[in-house]
Amino acid sequence: MTAPVTRAAPEPLAERRIALVDLLDRLLAGGVVLTGDLTLSIADVDLVRVDLKALISSVGEDVPSPWEPLREVRP
């Protein structure tokens, strides 16, 4: 019979430190989908409703920008 293996608990996510630049690089490399709903109401009457659906990803040669490049404006 084998002896039970005890493993240390992994570090909590709050204790891990990561630079913002590294986080953005990881997120943009694979892409991020954001969705959300916001409703502003007074006395149970909905006044404003906002639905957010966004896809955020990096632009490269494989996935070109959908907008034309900006032209230089000379004074």
Curated annotation (Swiss-Prot):
It holds the Pfam family Gas_vesicle. Keywords: Gas vesicle. The gene is gvpS. This is Gas vesicle protein S. It is found in: Gas vesicle. Induction: Gas vesicle production is induced by growth conditions that promote production of secondary metabolites tiancimycin A and B. This strain probably produces some gas vesicles from the probable gvpO-gvpA-gvpF-gvpG-gvpJ-gvpL-gvpS-gvpK operon; it can be induced to produce more under certain growth conditions. The lineage of its organism: Bacteria, Bacillati, Actinomycetota, Actinomycetes, Kitasatosporales. It comes from the Bacteria. Belongs to the gas vesicle GvpA family. One of its GO terms (molecular function) is structural molecule activity. InterPro entries: Gas-vesicle_GvpA-like, GvpA. Its main location: other. One of its GO terms (cellular component) is vesicle membrane.
